[in-house]
């Protein structure tokens, strides 16, 4: 809590102070020192992220599909349940220190921005936003409100990334002239057009909340969960899903800046799906 309130300078100091000096004998953290955290989008990746936050107070959880998120709600019986993040913010944001966002890509920016505008720190799953422009807006919000932020790019913290960077920087593999990066994505259904007919919205689903800023369309089970990644209105395709993992080591290791040229190709181009 002190770290979030005092910024990076205080954090550096706290990092080298033993727990006993801070009054946390044997590593025990008083309840008053724990962070109050809200989770938005908890059924998929959000569930794993929350597992890493178990040491803190998970006070509120929001999922647009309560059936998909039921196993997570059961993990945190003390957390209040919502199916619309706006209602959770209205009721609980004032009591929160930070918000975890792991919804479909197209709602990352608005959910994070609303929390940041209220002065709350955020952890947002990758891809950070649906568009580059949204990412720039969040950067401005973070600077304006002096917030701690993090994107969920777990691979960037792996030992393998640090090792390959050291190899490159130490010249152990010689001059790098070409890098090939590949992925098993997309592993969702491909080459789809929008369904001609919609389906009845499940009783456990808040479809309007899932759509968020996306254009209105009838509910269909092909959109969510998981497969939203393959629909442009909701996801960012294979590039948005995996480039942060497989290209980050390349950019870090070779210390690359913005690209000078990008070329893309596909055997099939569709307006609806990736």
Set out the residue ranges of the language-model regions.
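N-terminal Rossmann-fold NAD(P) dinucleotide-binding loop
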Residues: 46-47, 108
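NAD(P)-dependent dehydrogenases' Rossmann-like dinucleotide-binding region
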Residues: 41, 172-190, 202-220, 260-270
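N-terminal secretory signal peptides and thylakoid transit peptides that target proteins
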Residues: 1-11
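NAD(P)-binding Rossmann-fold cofactor-contacting core
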Residues: 58-75
């Amino acid at each position: 809590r002190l770290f979030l309130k005092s910024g990076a300078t205080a954090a550096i100091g706290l990092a080298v102070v033993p727990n006993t000096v801070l009054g946390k004998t044997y590593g025990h953290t008083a309840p008053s020192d724990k962070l109050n955290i809200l989770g938005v989008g908890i059924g998929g990746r959000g569930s794993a992220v929350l597992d890493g936050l178990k040491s803190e107070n998970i006070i509120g959880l929001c999922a647009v599909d309560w059936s998909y998120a039921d196993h997570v709600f059961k993990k945190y019986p003390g957390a209040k349940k919502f199916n619309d993040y706006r209602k959770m913010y209205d009721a609980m944001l004032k009591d929160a220190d930070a918000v975890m966002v792991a919804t479909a890509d197209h709602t990352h920016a608005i959910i994070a921005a609303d929390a940041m505008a209220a002065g709350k720190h955020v952890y947002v799953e990758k891809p950070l936003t649906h568009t580059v422009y949204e990412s720039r807006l969040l950067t401005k919000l973070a600077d304006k409100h002096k917030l701690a932020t993090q994107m969920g790019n777990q691979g960037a913290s792996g030992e393998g990334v640090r090792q390959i960077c050291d190899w490159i920087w130490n010249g152990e593999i010689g001059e790098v002239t070409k890098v090939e990066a590949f992925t098993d994505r997309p592993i969702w259904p491909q080459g789809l057009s929008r369904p001609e007919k919609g389906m009845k919205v499940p009783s456990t689903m808040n479809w309007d909340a899932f759509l968020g800023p996306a254009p209105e369309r009838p509910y269909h089970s092909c959109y969510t969960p998981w497969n939203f990644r393959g629909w442009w209105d909701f996801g960012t395709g294979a590039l948005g899903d995996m480039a942060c993992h497989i290209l980050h080591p390349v950019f870090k290791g070779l210390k690359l800046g913005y690209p000078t040229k990008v070329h893309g190709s596909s055997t099939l181009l569709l307006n609806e799906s990736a």
